């Protein structure tokens, strides 16, 4: 039996968000990075968030954004989590400790040195994603999970997670998984059949 949190990221419409929540998602992610194909304006995200059940945590993804703008979106969208998915430093992330929000730093992993970097961040969680020189997340790439080792923080695993590799991901003993492109029909649009298959498998693993 495995207890693992499930985060569905890159949501752009109510139908996908509601379906993810109904299927069992613990966290729903909205991408506020304008250059992403999954970008959603905060004003549009609010319209979706307002209709979602209270039991799901709302996560806002940002890339190299300003403190002021992120603080504004936290208030506007009533975010539970802020996910830093760019080149944010530990010092930059620490300043959000004054706000009523939990924080998660994404580490884009190339090798074991990047895994060690996770220990430098005093965030509520660490998200390990595959490195891509041109993209900040949502690439569908998978890094070598065997190098993860022991990290003294809550670890979310991202990068190409789907129904085919979910069992191996969960067996790593991580805190949560972050799924985006693995359950999409195209960037920003979820494939509900893929989501259902994924959640059915997770339910079996949870026991």
Where do the language-model regions lie?
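Conserved N-terminal beta1-alpha1 strand-loop-helix module at the mouth
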Residues: 1-207
């Amino acid at each position: 039996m495995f207890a693992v949190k499930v985060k569905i990221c890159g949501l752009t419409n109510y139908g996908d968000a509601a379906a993810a929540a109904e299927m069992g998602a613990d966290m729903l992610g909205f991408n506020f990075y304008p250059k992403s194909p999954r970008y959603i304006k905060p004003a549009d995200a609010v319209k979706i968030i307002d209709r979602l059940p209270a039991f799901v945590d709302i996560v806002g993804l940002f890339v190299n954004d300003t403190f002021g703008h992120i603080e504004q979106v936290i208030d506007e969208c009533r975010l539970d989590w802020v996910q830093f998915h760019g080149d944010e430093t530990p010092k930059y992330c620490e300043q959000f400790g004054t706000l009523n929000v939990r924080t998660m730093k994404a580490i884009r992993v190339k090798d074991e040195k990047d895994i060690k970097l996770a220990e430098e961040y005093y965030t509520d969680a660490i998200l390990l994603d595959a490195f891509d020189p041109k993209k900040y997340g949502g690439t569908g790439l998978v890094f070598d999970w065997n190098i993860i080792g022991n990290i003294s923080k809550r670890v979310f695993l991202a990068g190409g997670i789907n129904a085919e590799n979910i069992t191996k991901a969960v067996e790593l003993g991580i805190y949560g998984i972050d799924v985006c492109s693995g359950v999409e029909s195209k960037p920003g649009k979820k494939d509900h059949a893929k989501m259902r298959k994924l959640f059915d498998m997770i339910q079996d693993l949870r026991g």
